Curated annotation (Swiss-Prot):
The J domain is necessary and sufficient to stimulate DnaK ATPase activity. Zinc center 1 plays an important role in the autonomous, DnaK-independent chaperone activity of DnaJ. Zinc center 2 is essential for interaction with DnaK and for DnaJ activity. It comes from Janthinobacterium sp. (strain Marseille) (Minibacterium massiliensis). The gene is dnaJ. SMART domains: DnaJ. Its cofactor is Zn(2+). This is Chaperone protein DnaJ.
Amino acid sequence: MAKRDFYEILGVGKSASDEEIKKAYRKLAMKHHPDRNPDSKGAEDKFKEAKEAYEMLSDPQKRDAYDRYGHAGVDPNMGGGGGGGGFADAFGDIFGDIFGQAGGGRGGRGGPQVYRGADLRYNLEITLEQAAHGYDTTIRVPSWDNCETCDGSGAKPGTSPVNCTTCGGHGQVRMQQGFFSVLQTCPKCHGSGKINPSPCGTCSGAGKIKRNKTLEVKIPSGIDDGMRIRSSGNGEPGMNGGPPGDLYVEIRIKQHPMFQRDGDDLHCEIPISFAKAALGGEIEVPTLNGKASFTIPEGTQSGKTFRLRSKGIKGVRSGYAGDLFCHVIVETPVTLTERQKELMREFEQLTIEGGSKHSPQTKSWKDKVKEFFE
């Protein structure tokens, strides 16, 4: 099975502090520690899973690489020498597992273990316009591929892997646990059943090398922030003939200077002049598909919201367009000329003489103040 998200394992968000991550790990470690659950294989697996997640997220450099690229951003424990098991360690056990190595699947009875490749994650930042209209792009994803020098065998050219002398090529060894006989992943070949007496110099016997893979990604119109696009088979390669993992492209939408998105709806603030608010009239507003206009009535107050139907974003699932909500902001004039100030004073005097009919909210507020002090 594919590796789970490290943040999900610990039950914390991606913005969690170091202390929160440490606290979450301690809680899980206490709950699932093998000494407290001697007969629970599930608890033991969860304990190892939590430990691996903590080891990655507690290291600032590893956490940064994981946040950017997912599991592919964290280097496997690549080792050289005769074992050729460095790459296998990336899928393997933290402490050693007498019940069989965690994180993979078992092949034929007594044969080498087969592992599905790890899933990869790639964060892709796009604009709101690209999200609304769809977008085709290419991305470069760091991934592990078969070493071309040794064709993935891990052996030096001209040589071949040989059966592991510890497990006889089976990838597993049998251990006696009291009255029970159980299979354990071979500690020498790490489940592959093979060792390389002469490891490949390019990949140090791992059979894998890290490189950037260029992929085309089609972003559907209407996609929202946080949605993921799955690219099957473009994750890390499997082990011992296992299938490759998948690539998940997680969408991040840049903040727009004018619009705020709420699902398929859009919101924007529209500044209008004092005169336009008082007299009413037609105003022109931008949308993601061009310009639109609507009429505001006389006496429009600041904060009034106008709804333009179907001027939002067409939903990626619903197929229907959301609405555009225009929030009117009446702008108070500044840097007035003397003539403008004179006219404003005259206007203010006329408003006072006209009584509450010109400023009903002001009249209501004054009445409330008067009642408050009486």
